[in-house]
Amino acid sequence: MFSVLILIPVIGLLIYFLYYRKLKPHKVNNIREMYAEGLDMLVSGKRIAAYKNFKSIINEDSNNIKAYLRLGQILREGGNAIKALKIHKSLILRKKITNYEKIELHKNMALNYYELDNFDK
C-alpha cells in the first residue's frame, strides 16, 4: 500500500515532465527551426518575412552570427547597403566567431562596399 502511494506521484511527475518537454521544445532546436524557416523564406522570395524571422532569432540569441549575416544580406539586397554594412561591421569585434563565419562576414562586407561603389576598403 505504501509503495502504491509513492508510485502514483512518481508516475504523475514523469507524465508531467514528458508532456512538458513535448510542449516546450528546447530553445536551441527552436532557433535552428526558425533559421531554417528564414532560409526557406529567403529562397522563396519572401524577404520581409525572412527579415522579421532573422530579427526575432537575434532577439532570442544575440550571439547567432549567421542570423546577423542573413539580416545584413536581406538589407543589402533590398537596397540598404549602408545599414547592412553597419550590421556586418558590428560583428568584426566578436570573439566567438568561427573561421567560416569570418569568411562569410568579409565576403558580405565586400559585397556591401561593392554595392556602395566604395572599392577603397
Task: Give residue ranges: language-model regions.
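Long, contiguous interaction/recruitment modules in multidomain scaffold/adaptor proteins
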Residues: M1-N29
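Helix-centric, low-specificity signal for extended rod-like, repetitive segments
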Residues: L14-I15, L69, I87
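Alpha-helical segment of the N-proximal tetratricopeptide repeat
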Residues: N29-N63, E77-N80, K86, S90-L93, ...
